[in-house]
């Protein structure tokens, strides 16, 4: 069986590098399934979950990665994902995310309109909200 080489990179380094059966990317245009033999393409990543399925020889398990922004470069036998933000759903600590969100909101309240730091804290709050949404969705529906 053909395999798809996948590299998943975020700003702090390489998150994953190895073969997968297929993956479903979240893009601004919707979801995009990628299997071996896919046409060459570069897509902008949206906010949501990239769903990855391991090779059957590796157990065929699925794992989800929450992403926000970035790009994916696809060719016939591989995909390189360069995500602005990325975290495996299994690695999300809801209490830590809530704490980070509260701190960002406190800082946001202290920053005046027009201050360049405002965009940073707003982005941090959006990222935390996205993480919490996925944790809530996963526990409510019993996903993966």
Where are these regions (language model features)?
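Short linear sequence motifs
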Residues: 1, 9, 64, 113-114
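N-terminal export/targeting signal detector
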Residues: 1-9, 14, 137-140
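Compact, glycine-rich, soluble single-domain proteins
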Residues: 7-98, 103
